[in-house]
């Protein structure tokens, strides 16, 4: 579990965190007194200035849209009190490809790319390609190298199959939660990032045409992008006393 100066760990007691019984937990941390993963850049999709400074290009992308939602953290309300209020954010969807440039540490040992997304679009899959960053205004195509496939299964919609009788026919009940925000991460190997102060990233959408269950209409498929954050793996720097 990578983290910076601190980590917030939430434990849910009971189905909706309603249990008031005594509970204790102990956490052990094994690490070094210096960071080995540092944030080096962030692209906010839907923000014109951020898209421009990161040379964001996505010809088939939707216009920016705003949603008010939550992460999968816990109950919205408990005993009439709102625990996790909804927040608003902007993003786009694409059914083609997106390209952008992110700064990284030249002495990196690899890069972790984190994406904030709209989880209402199921089974998001894309090919990831990495190339050398180009100066602004230069249109030469990078020499792309494959970094792998980025896949996030599922969505905020699920199906419960509860037959009325023990041997009865399946009864599909489809439910959609209000948690549309989600973070997902993709690791870029060092051979594609070492010695570079910035990288050009290409994400090409590959649809997964699988219905929620046989006979259910195929949902709207797209690659969602709200924010891309680059974290560089670095050698920890510290002095022994």
Give short role names for the model-derived ranges.
Residues 1-54:
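Charged, alpha-helix-forming regions
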Residues 1, 81-112, 116-240:
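Beta-strand-rich ligand-recognition modules
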